[in-house]
Amino acid sequence: MTDIHIQDGDLSSLKDKVVVITGGSSGIGLATTNLLLDLGAKVVIGDLQPPTTRVDSERCSFHKVDVTVWSDQLTLFKEARELHGRIDHVFANAGVGPKADYLSTALDQNGDLVEPTFLTLDVNLKAVIYTATIACYYMREEQQSPAGGSIVIVSSVAGVSRFRAVDYATAKHGNLGFARGLHQRLTAENSPTRVNLIAPSWTNTGFMPPQIMAAVGVEPQEPASVGRAAAYLMADDSRKGQMIHIAKGRYREVEESIMLPAAEKVVDVENGGVMEDDTLAKIIETMGIFKAKATQ
């Protein structure tokens, strides 16, 4: 696991870039917005409410968006391109805390078990898929530069570990799975669009009251530390299919250095095991050959 040391110069390429951020009005999203503006980027925020603090820049625009609504996100991207002519980077950041209790015994007026809420899964997973899907469309359509655009997705340490906030953990595991699969598809199609993730540890975003965190002896990191990792993944076009873990200002790449090697051990690649995606690639190729022969 390699530590990453992010220097100010590493982010300089973001000057004049156009970045769409969902959930950019508070927490990690707002911290990232402010950093990008300081770097000279142009930021388009999609959120339910305007920024919680004044963002004093003509290069930042706010658009009221419910990220769980497909048409709202479509409008966000359309307006971003109308404003700036292109979209260079997308930060799929909008999220909420855990909401569902899968052990609840609450009954409705008919005496039946109450359906659990899907709000956290809708915001933290479904909406992220919406954001990335639309981002891929715009980046592919515009055929920007050879370096391509990039998508950064917010996962969490809860997405790689056991975490008893079940709906939140499920969504964050889903973020990782979605990004992994999307990276493989983009790579297979030789697309220049990059997808990466960040996995922050406890961060001061209002997820938990500060007095509670202090009582359990945990000092959350500031959102600005997390935003710096997101900006770094946008700026460094060598970063593809990676995930940066952030804890108290320390940055470490964990997908390629830890988790993928662990998967290879599960499959036992060293002793002839074959990764599932390698098999799927051969299946797709073989089906294409059969289809071509059938049409001859």
From Swiss-Prot:
The organism's place on the tree of life at top rank: Eukaryota
The GO terms this record gives for MF are: oxidoreductase activity
**Signal peptide limits:** none
Q: Which reaction does it catalyse?
A: ascofuranol + A = ascofuranone + AH2
> In its UniProt record, which GO terms are filed under biological process?
terpenoid biosynthetic process
Which keywords, in A-to-Z order, does the entry hold? NADP, Oxidoreductase
Q: Where is the active site?
A: S155, Y168, K172
Record pathway: Secondary metabolite biosynthesis; terpenoid biosynthesis
E.C. number, please?
Answer: 1.1.99.-
For this chain, the family text in UniProt reads: Belongs to the short-chain dehydrogenases/reductases (SDR) family.
Name the record gives this protein: Short-chain dehydrogenase/reductase ascJ
Q: Which organism is it from?
A: Acremonium egyptiacum
Q: What is the lineage of its organism?
A: Eukaryota, Fungi, Dikarya, Ascomycota, Pezizomycotina
| Gene that produces this protein | ascJ
